[in-house]
A protein has these predicted regions:
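Conserved S-adenosyl-L-methionine
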Residues: 118-120, 148
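Conserved SAM-binding loop of SAM-dependent methyltransferases across substrates and taxa
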Residues: 121-138
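Extended basic-aromatic, gly/pro-enriched interface segments that bind polyanionic ligands
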Residues: 140-192
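Short, well-ordered alpha-helices that flank and scaffold nucleotide-derived cofactor binding pockets
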Residues: 96, 100, 130-134, 159
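Conserved RecA-like P-loop NTPase ATPase core
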Residues: 94, 119, 157
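Alpha-helical elements of the RecA-like P-loop NTPase motor core of helicases
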Residues: 92, 126, 155
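Conserved AdoMet
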Residues: 2-115
């Protein structure tokens, strides 16, 4: 079994390769001082594949252009930090500036489409949906598209299932009981 140090050591040419790989597939810029991110986040992939080091992982990626492993590397380097009503000032601006304007400009069409890029597990997209419903847009045709580089987090978003700790983080109690139903230790979005 290789030591943790041997797994984590990255030769400079491999570090540059990883930087370029992540940038070209995700647009994420990882500066020279981010070795620790590669080391901590790629070590589990190295172990899972039975490799001896991150350098071996780079060799595999360069030699085969293995798309599944390449995707795992990119997903490992993304930060899936999200919670309900993250950045309250943003939601205030949506309520007080954007929605009144959209209501005026789209009154005849009554259709709105939003894109939640880097949606992670969906809390921010669902927060937007709740804002729209609370602000009287329930009879409008609303579409919110959530996208993310990570397939597993998108699957979680689609499920609409959240743990208690996740709903406690930013979600007002009144909206929790209005838009979610409890199921054991979890909360599921209802069809409101």
């Amino acid at each position: 079994m290789p030591s943790q140090t041997s797994i984590a050591e990255i030769r400079s040419e491999n570090y540059r390769f990883l930087q370029q790989h992540v940038y070209s597939h995700a647009g994420i810029v990882l500066e020279e001082d981010k070795h620790y991110l590669f080391e901590s986040r790629l070590a589990p992939i190295v172990k899972q594949l039975g490799l001896n080091s991150i350098n071996d992982l780079c060799t595999l990626l360069m030699a085969t252009r293995e798309t599944q492993v390449g995707r795992q590397v990119v997903e490992a380097m993304t930060t899936n930090e999200t919670y309900f009503f993250r950045d309250p000032a943003q939601y205030d601006a949506i309520r007080t500036v954007l929605l009144p304007r959209l209501r005026r400009e789209r009154q005849n069409m009554r259709t709105l489409r939003f894109w939640s890029a880097a949606a992670s597990t969906g809390q921010e997209a669902y927060s937007l949906a709740m804002v729209l419903l609370e602000d009287g847009f329930s009879d409008w045709n609303i579409q919110i598209l959530g996208t993310d580089l990570s397939s597993p987090v998108l699957e979680r978003a689609r499920s609409g299932k959240y743990q208690q700790i996740e709903v406690n983080r930013g979600l007002p109690a009144a909206l929790l009981v209005k838009y979610f139903r409890r199921s054991g230790m979890d909360w599921h979005l209802s069809e409101a």
